[in-house]
Amino acid sequence: MKKYKRLLLMAGLVTLVFVLSACGTAPVSESSTGIWDRYIVYYFAQAIKFLSLGGSVGIGIILFTLVIRIILLPLMHFQTKSMRKTQELQPQLKALQQKYSSKDPETQRLFREEQQRLYAENNVNPYIGCLPLLVQLPIMMALYQAISRVPELKEGTFLWLSLDKPDPYLILPILAAVFTFASTYLSSMSQLETNASLKIMNYVMPAMIFFMGISLASSLSLYWVVSNAFQTGQTLLLNNPFKIRKEREEAARQAKARERALERAKSPKKKGKKK
């Protein structure tokens, strides 16, 4: 149940971003007041304009997104390591679930204490998986408002796109959904077990991105395409699921070979005793 609650929380947070994004509509400039408008949205816009090589706002958004992803790289790497540790603890967690299978409050309290102790001993935070999303939500909100509320960016174009309007050909929403699926699917491949909520997330998130992409500014779809393409490449480079699976298969093969060797070593002794 907790896994489904976490899934609903993440979906709700994404929706909340765009509800809040629509709240501010007044143009943002150097004379704007308020911490959000003056120091976040305004400076996001300035950064995008600075990176808009040749006056192309689209290039500015692409470069800005890459800079943000590079800054977040240590956090994402930490998240990946933490998730792998959590997966390695699954056999011990299952043993705890069997030990404290009763649903009475006292047993469940003991289970939670043992679970937290296991996490603490292995330096694992099971909620770290939500952290990158929580960090990126205000970035997406600020980017959306910078494009829609700063006149110089609002009038920007890129290739066939008017950046303050949805992509008329749906190319960016489709690419955003494809790269979102690729990044989430590759991440789930490296896990020992994929629970039901993660399987659902593999399809729910791309669908949400697509449907929001067909109705929101194409600047946001461009951000999603670049961000999730970067995430896909990062996963293949730093947490390659194909390599991890091969390593696990090799480790399992070696473990079985050691077991067979021990059995063969014990067999002559048993025969000798019979004589």
Swiss-Prot record:
Transmembrane regions: 53-73, 127-147, 169-189, 206-226
S-diacylglycerol cysteine lipid modification positions: C23
Compositional bias per record (Basic and acidic residues), positions renumbered to this chain: 249-266
Lipid-linked residues (N-palmitoyl cysteine): C23
GO-annotated cellular components: plasma membrane
Membrane topology: Multi-pass membrane protein
Chief location bin: membrane
GO molecular function terms attached to this record: membrane insertase activity
Cross-referenced InterPro entries: YidC/ALB3/OXA1/COX18 (IPR001708), YidC/Oxa/ALB_C (IPR028055), YidC/YidC1/YidC2_Firmicutes (IPR023060), YidC_ALB_C (IPR047196)
Cellular localization per UniProt: Cell membrane
Function noted in UniProt: Required for the insertion and/or proper folding and/or complex formation of integral membrane proteins into the membrane. Involved in integration of membrane proteins that insert both dependently and independently of the Sec translocase complex, as well as at least some lipoproteins.
Protein name, UniProt field: Membrane protein insertase YidC
Source organism (scientific name): Enterococcus faecalis (strain ATCC 700802 / V583)
Name of the coding gene: yidC
